[in-house]
A protein has these predicted regions:
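Glycine-rich phosphate-binding loop plus the immediately following alpha-helix
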Residues: 105, 137-178, 200-208
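Glycine-rich phosphate-binding/hydrolytic loop that grips phosphoryl groups
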Residues: 109, 272-315
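Short beta-strand scaffold segments in enzyme catalytic cores
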Residues: 13-19, 122, 130-134
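Conserved phosphate-binding catalytic cores of ATP/NTP-utilizing and phosphoryl-transfer enzymes
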Residues: 1, 100-121, 287-288
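N-terminal beta-alpha supersecondary unit
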Residues: 2-64, 70-74, 103
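Short glycine-rich phosphate-binding loop at a beta-alpha junction
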Residues: 64-73, 238-249, 270-273
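Short Gly/Thr/Asp-enriched flexible loops that form oxyanion-binding sites at enzyme active sites
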Residues: 70-96, 252-260
């Protein structure tokens, strides 16, 4: 069986082609990039997706799919609708079933596929999501998460204020290599974190301190918080595998800090490769393969859910 996956939750329109053995046959994407100092405009991101969708889909269709999966949420509603509509259009064209998948779960499952881990804790870090997750009682349970904004949104918000191009993460990581530490608010509550205090503090410091110092301090403080709550979750769940996934998983410093923590615990660690860490269609396709029993040709029932949480999904498969 071959599944075409369509990702369109935020700035990226991506398509992937994956078979039932987990072989990734194609993975193509194009990203909407707002001007420096600006965030994602949902209407402009939607138009970007409409403009590139057929080209990106055609590049991935090196073989005829047996089914189509699309990211139904969480995400920006205008962007989600583009992916859903294209999934329905191509499913009708090929007369094949369609299945909605949860964007967050797709990040987790592509991580498990690549890591070949059986029962990991997962640190999922992206623009809108920052969660510490493990599988318990037929669902992925969120043991810790941000109480305000995602770590990726924090990086991009700071980047906008500092006039750093979107997405800001890679340039912040590079600037941080030359920085020195400045104390910032450190907010951990059990296994939850908050980033809004750090954001406010950093924005007030722009222009008063070297940008390299601000980038370094942002990373060191926020990543230490994430590693602390992740280690706490691993101890609580008594698990000895950790997967770092999501767009921010591409950050080498965060991966290094996670690896050090795992080594000290005698645990295994896997950083999802950069081409699969961020938003892309291959993860949607693989999640479609896993949830193939839910696929249907009732195209008019295809829905989106912009607030669809990780822990609301019943896991009907064994990955």
């Amino acid at each position: 069986m071959i599944c075409l996956g369509i990702e369109s939750t935020a700035h990226t329109f991506g398509t992937g082609l994956v078979d039932s053995k987990g072989n990734i046959l194609a993975n193509v994407k194009d990203m909407y990039r707002p001007p420096a100092g600006w965030g994602i405009d949902p209407s402009k991101a939607k138009q970007h997706h409409i403009d590139v969708a057929d080209k990106i889909i055609s590049e991935a269709l090196i073989e005829k799919p047996d089914m189509i999966a699309y990211a139904a949420g969480p995400g920006l509603p205008p962007c989600l609708k583009v992916g859903r509509d294209k999934a329905v259009e191509y499913a009708k064209k090929f007369n094949i079933p369609i299945v909605p998948v949860n964007h967050c779960i797709a990040h987790l499952e592509i991580g498990k596929l690549l890591a070949k881990f059986k029962d990991p804790v997962m640190l999922y870090v992206s623009g809108g999501n920052t969660q510490v997750i493990a599988f318990e009682a037929e669902r992925y349970r969120v043991f810790g998460e941000t109480e305000d904004i995602g770590i990726g949104n924090l990086l991009d918000a700071f980047g906008r204020a500092a006039k750093i191009d979107f997405p800001a993460g890679p340039e912040i990581e590079e600037l941080a290599k030359k920085g020195k530490y400045i104390e910032l608010p450190y907010s951990v509550k059990g296994m939850d974190v908050t980033f809004s205090g750090i954001k406010t503090k950093l924005e007030k410091m722009i222009g008063k301190f070297p940008i390299e110092d601000l980038c370094y301090s942002l990373q060191e403080t926020c990543f230490a918080m994430l590693v602390e709550v992740t280690e706490r979750a691993m101890a609580h769940c008594q698990k000895n595998e950790l997967i770092l996934t999501g767009g921010v998983a591409a950050n080498k410093r965060l991966a290094e800090m996670c690896a050090i923590m795992c080594k000290e615990r005698g645990a295994k660690f896997f950083q999802v490769p950069i081409q699969y860490a961020g938003d892309q269609g291959a993860m949607i396709a693989w999640n479609g393969i896993l949830s193939k029993e839910l696929a249907t040709k009732k195209y008019d029932k295809s829905e989106i859910n912009s607030k669809w949480r990780t822990d609301e999904v019943d896991i009907t498969w064994k990955s």
